[in-house]
């Protein structure tokens, strides 16, 4: 009987150690869930984890591979089940519900002054909810125009630069000029139309989500919000300068037509350059151009990639120390190069490797100062609003099935009904 009791006690002690992520007198084990997916990025993350483990005997990190495709639901399930990783890789526009729901630790007093001062305040705004900071924004990318350089040179159009971009009306005129004979000036890959539309609309003064003094958010589709949607709609349905078949496509789906000379330009995230370098036919001449500018210049919204700490983690200080290690300037540069994105940190962004003309890194770096928090950044209920209201409404508008008035009505009326449930 005594042996049986002793066995039960030992099992309970072992279970306690496993739950604790390490014994009091042994090494702590942190679980780091990474969403890196490109080979270079996965390699960089795993090498940094190995470097940490080689130099920290008391705190070991276990690399866990996650997926962007299912991260929100996967994290929600793990939070509710008490099985969340200690260090969480995500994007800032996915954090609001988790932060307000109490699933993420407030990092305000956990992060070192070095890291806080290195990342600009506009980036910290993307992970600040209420009085707390619930993630460290570390990688971001502008949306750019990837262009067939030879085609543009032959046409004689003005080539835009970050200092002198095209305006939205100029962009529309140029895509008309580049079109004809079954070819299009632009191919918009808008399988996921909401974030692209809202983020680019900042250049025209669009905001869409408006917060009152009490923190209540409502949707108002105003003149600035209409500039980008109307441009896309008219390029497709009026000018015939944008391919209608790519509206339901992802960015990668447009590349064969781009390489084949069917589209002069494709609006894509800056990181798509990696696929272009890998897949472009030999001798294909391409270049990166800034997105068009509006009343607010080349401003555009971004939702940076983030690193957070689970509220239920028993080792929050150690997790924050690991994040600080990952985001030292040289390490942040490695992560940025691996993901073909821009670092948020000022020291990392100044690295010469990110200002070279090769693969147009310099063009992207020149746009970094104009990146702002995405309009949907602080909106509770945004995932449901996006999936149930905004995505079908924008898709139908871009295809010509509905007009601008109905788009406005659905975004505002149906959208505010959804958001109201999250603000009771």
Regions from the language model: what does each represent?
Residues 134-138, 143, 169-218, 263:
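Extracytoplasmic/periplasmic solute-binding protein
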Residues 85-86, 115-151, 174-176, 185, ...:
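A structural signal for short loop-to-beta-strand junctions that line the ligand-binding cleft
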Residues 105-119, 161-164, 186, 206-228, ...:
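Short, solvent-exposed loop/beta-turn-alpha elements that line the ligand-binding surface or hinge
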Residues 92-144, 200, 285-289, 356-358:
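Hinge/lid segment of periplasmic solute-binding proteins
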Residues 2-97, 270, 295-296, 317-318, ...:
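Conserved N-terminal structural module of periplasmic/extracytoplasmic solute-binding proteins
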Residues 286, 337-388, 396, 420-424:
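Long, aromatic- and glycine/proline-rich binding clefts that accommodate carbohydrate-like moieties
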Residues 175-177, 214-247:
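Glycine-centered hinge/linker elements that transmit conformational signals in sensory
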Residues 50, 54, 155, 234, ...:
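Extracytoplasmic/periplasmic substrate-recognition and gating elements
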